[in-house]
Design a protein with these regions (language model features):
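Residue-level recognition of oxygen-bearing side chains
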Residues: 26, 90, 139, 167-168
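A short acidic, often aromatic-flanked loop/helix-cap motif at beta-alpha or helix-coil junctions
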Residues: 90-95, 112-115, 163
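Structured adenosyl-cofactor binding patch, chiefly the S-adenosyl-L-methionine
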Residues: 141-184
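Conserved residues at beta->alpha junctions
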Residues: 21, 136, 166-167
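RNA substrate-binding interface of SAM-dependent RNA methyltransferases
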Residues: 7-106
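Active-site/ligand-binding-proximal alpha/beta "capping" segment
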Residues: 104-139, 143-144, 153-156
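Short, hinge-like loop/turn segments at secondary-structure boundaries
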Residues: 59-63, 123, 174-175
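Short, small-residue-biased leader/transition segments that mark boundaries at the very start
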Residues: 1-6
Length: 184
């Protein structure tokens, strides 16, 4: 039935990507690829090192455009839902929005080794809401990571190489997808 199709096409966990606002049109590629990989919603976040500053009118038209990109990527990849692209949030609003999610992760280049990543992923269960915070170009400020840690967001590593902001979201999505679907 329909429920089976839904189950087959969608990840067993809902992934919420909090993406630090990148420069130029990188966000379009991030949205397209993360939608292909199964993300549930994407929240653009104005972080300390985000170079881009969008006024309200500009932000609205950007988000509308991003939503269309999400729609076409969802259709093209056979998704049964269209991931929502949220209005731009501040870091404070974003961590508050994520506070009740089951697992909250923040890839951070100063995080040593993959053990924390493995442990965090091993706790994922079907039906969970997973928040993933990605810094913009230039990464996360130390105080953003500290604030995140205070709120139960776990710093993880995505490997020994420093990833660009547009690569980090894809990497964590692919890792989560593999982890959740490798038993099938």
């Amino acid at each position: 039935g329909l429920g089976d199709v839904y189950k087959r096409q969608e990840l067993p966990c809902r992934i919420h990507l909090f993406q630090g606002l990148p420069k130029g049109d990188k966000m379009e590629m991030i949205i397209q690829k993360c939608v292909e990989l199964g993300v549930n919603e994407i929240i653009p976040v104005a972080m300390k090192r985000s170079v881009v500053r969008l006024d309200e009118k500009k932000a609205k038209s950007k988000v509308a455009r991003w939503q269309l990109i999400s729609e076409s990527a969802a259709k093209q990849s056979g998704r049964t839902i269209i991931p929502c692209i949220h209005e731009v949030m501040s870091f404070k609003e974003a961590v508050n929005y994520a506070k009740d999610m089951d697992v909250k992760l923040i890839p951070y280049e100063l995080c040593e080794g993959m053990r924390a990543t493995k442990e965090a992923l091993s706790g994922l269960k079907s039906g969970m809401d997973v928040a993933v915070f990605i810094g913009p170009e230039g990464g996360l400020e130390v105080e953003e990571v500290e604030k995140a840690k205070e709120l139960g967001i776990i710093p993880i590593s995505l490997g020994k190489r420093i990833l660009r902001t547009e690569t980090a979201g894809l990497a964590i999505m692919a890792i989560i997808m593999y982890h959740l679907e490798s038993g099938e």
